Amino acid sequence: MSSFVADKIVMDGLTYDDVLLIPAYSEVLPKQVELKTKFSRNIELNVPFVTAAMDTVTEASMAIAIAREGGIGVIHKNMTIEEQARQVAIVKRAENGMIYDPVTIRRGSTVKDALDMMHDYHIGGIPVVDDENHLVGIVTNRDLRFERHMDKKIDEVMTSENLVTTHIQTDLVAAASILQENKIEKLPVVDNENRLVGLITYKDITKAKDKPMACKDAKGRLRVAAGVGVTVDTLDRAKALVEAGADAIVIDTAHGHSKGVVEKLKQVKAAFPQVDVVVGNVATGEAAKYLVENGADGVKVGIGPGSICTTRVVAGVGVPQLSAVYDVYSALKGTGVPLIADGGLRYSGDVVKALAAGGSCVMIGSLVAGTEESPGDTIIFNGRKFKSYRGMGSLEAMEQKNGSKDRYFQGDTKDAKKLVPEGIAGRVPYKGTVQEVIYQLIGGLRSGMGYCGAATIENLHNAKFARITNAGVLESHPHDITITS
């Protein structure tokens, strides 16, 4: 037995419940700490939260909500290429400093065409242009609200006289004044020849004021990432996502330390060198270094820690999450490549521990599953509200036409009975809005950083841990009382 331990046991594996952070001298209050961090080599977040690329967690609504709070969402890939690209486009159009490629409608189109476009793009107004992109009018939902004749030409209902416009040099402060003075909500931006080059909306200006911490690109649009797999259509999917405006591509697999994943990484980086590519999942420093050496701009860490993941019991494989995060952090020091701690987080205290162990940010699934913005309908069960939540390795998720079986290297399996699930499906209590959940998580994170004397997440990496026993875990939670509130 001793030789087995000496030869085969190479590390002790610890997870979040095995440790507590040791309080340290502090000169910062929780409200003073800085939460800025990185998602990938070139993408900065204002809070260290990333929503998971899961079909019961992140679609456009979730990605918009988390970006407004300062994080970023990863749109899942359990859908057609066209639908995933559409989801990305919805996020990129949700807010803008100035919309540089506004949705337009051609002169001669019908009321039905305009209504369809408003529905598809979730917008309330469309500039009308001629064949040479000259602005000839604008049509809004107010113009169409009581219109019964769907085949009527847009020219007959649009506003074309006394159209208020501005030029490309106008900043948002000046634009806000123009909108207010003229009591309008949309301000077309034109060049010297009256060609449409952009659109500024009152709603976008208001949102920018209401959410100053929102995670945005250089054009004032919300940031969003999107997942791809290791399949024959990886490059086609990545191309569509990049064209739709995705800020990062996430190559999402169960085992990132593999030949096929690295080959896809090289192909995606070669095709789209301007876009950051995050790769996962891995659980060792060796794996992370291998990915970074081959071009990864971010590394996702976690094999089997998620609440809906069964990889560790089905395959017997994994590394307890705290140890995995620290091993990868140690390996990536000095590379400038961030690591994302993915999975195993149940409390805000776990977030603090994950970041203290070396995480740049955390990926959350169960913590935001069940929110208003997560995909799926709210169901009533025994008088309480729930929403569905499932692992991408669950049989449900893998059975779909555009399912996730390739994530678990079972893409060629045609018969559902031959699939080997590495996840489960279930339901979680309804949690309210993402804003409410993130507010509580940020509060716990700020408090933990204050206790550790860490003014920044980078400072938090210097915090020390105490290993605790099962008795310590019990002592850490409320005990010897009936909780009433």
For each predicted feature, which ranges?
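Glycine-rich phosphate-binding active-site loops on the catalytic face of alpha/beta enzymes
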Residues: 68-83, 246-258, 297-315, 345-379
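Alpha/beta catalytic cores of nucleotide-metabolism and tRNA/nucleoside-modifying enzymes
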Residues: 1-25, 105-106, 167, 227, ...
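Terminal amphipathic helices with adjacent charged low-complexity linkers/tails
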Residues: 77-91, 128, 132-148, 179, ...
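Short beta-strand/loop segments at the ligand-binding rim of alpha/beta enzyme cores
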Residues: 44-51, 97-102, 161, 217-227, ...
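Bateman/CBS regulatory modules and CBS-like beta-alpha motifs in cytosolic regions of diverse proteins
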Residues: 31-46, 52-54, 83-121, 128-130, ...
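Active-site-adjacent beta->alpha loops and helix N-cap segments on the catalytic face
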Residues: 31, 80-89, 147-151, 195-215, ...
